[in-house]
Amino acid sequence: PLEIIRIKANLTTNVDTYRNVFDYHTDFENIENGLTSIYYVNTNNGGTAFENGKFVKSEQNKLVTFPMNLKHRTVPHTDNNYERIVININYIKD
């Protein structure tokens, strides 16, 4: 079974993104078996960085899944694509 906790879409633009630094965070804490999936709607030179040093590039139709308590952050895009669109899904999988 699957229990959806939250689904949200994020859209960021490349206007002044070189000034934005996003902090590492977890989506939810203390949720057993909690997972986060990020679906990248479009390709750009941004992505998602993890506190453990891993980096996932924003590439169209890519889905990355990781434990909900793993610290991560948005890496803003600076290329000519005007927007970065992702869909975040937080859920519990038994």
Language-model features: locations:
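Fe(II)/2-oxoglutarate oxygenase catalytic core
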Residues: 1-63, 69, 74-86, 90-94
